[in-house]
Amino acid sequence: GIRATPHLMFKVNTNCMGCHLKKDLNKGHAVRTGAPETCAACHTPEHKKMLSDWRKQVGNEVKGAQELELEAQEALEQAIQKGFDSNTIAEAREMIAAGQKFLEIVRIGNGVHNKKYAITILDEAFINFEDTIDLLNDGG
């Protein structure tokens, strides 16, 4: 399973408003967002790039998981066409669905809010998709 991994800011008792200081508009609504300047204000000038680094890293991991998800789905389609037994097909579908749930958590939750935890969750998605491919490549 996935171990609880509190965000780094949790340890210093910082809530959303500690980082989301920049006033902005989103779909006509006033919102507060995180900004590189906010990171640098509390830390160092080098921390200005932290948010973009986190976004890039999480984005790359999500992209990788999505690509593996497609491979798992393609393997499932091929297994169905080859006439694999219904138990194997059902198991593969369950593993793909589990992987999709983990992937969706990070997509919806915006992984930069807790990068370490997001990567841990995405690891579970990767495992489910890889296990599906292995199951179907082994012939069930």
Regions found by a protein language model. Name each.
Residues 1-63, 67, 85, 105-120, ...:
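Inter-heme linker and motif-flanking segments adjacent to c-type heme-binding CXXCH motifs
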Residues 61-68, 91-97:
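Short amphipathic alpha-helical heptad-repeat segments
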Residues 65-79, 102:
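Non-transmembrane amphipathic alpha-helical segments
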Residues 82-125, 129:
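Amphipathic, non-membrane alpha-helical rod segments
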